[in-house]
Amino acid sequence: MLNMNLQFFAHKKGVGSTKNGRDSESKRLGAKRADGQFVKAGNILYRQRGTKIHPGTNVGIGGDDTLYAKVDGVLRFERVGRDKKQASVYPVVNE
């Protein structure tokens, strides 16, 4: 008599869970307009957390520390003192 011992194995490997594998969505922070670029009133100039760059002439600051232009003009990123930076918008004078 022929005795057959058949064993069946899983054809898919069991997958364990992991504690990794997720990340928060990026916030797209940083400069939105370049130095020397013409900007319009209301344009967002710089998105930031905290005041990495401070508002200068004709630049406002939003509730989330976003810098925006108050008037039409040319954007300038300037150094103030040793370690402070600010963004200013200077209106263009038409002659």
Swiss-Prot record:
Propeptide at 1-9
- Keywords of this entry: Ribonucleoprotein, Ribosomal protein
Q: Which GO terms describe its molecular function?
A: structural constituent of ribosome
Q: What modifications follow translation?
A: The N-terminus is cleaved by ribosomal processing cysteine protease Prp.
Q: Which GO terms describe its cellular component?
A: cytosolic large ribosomal subunit
Which domain of life does the UniProt lineage start with?
A: Bacteria
User: Could you mention a single GO BP entry for this protein?
Assistant: translation
HAMAP family, sorted: Ribosomal_bL27 (MF_00539)
Q: Which family does it belong to?
A: Belongs to the bacterial ribosomal protein bL27 family.
Q: Name the chain's protein.
A: Large ribosomal subunit protein bL27
The gene from which this protein is expressed is: rpmA
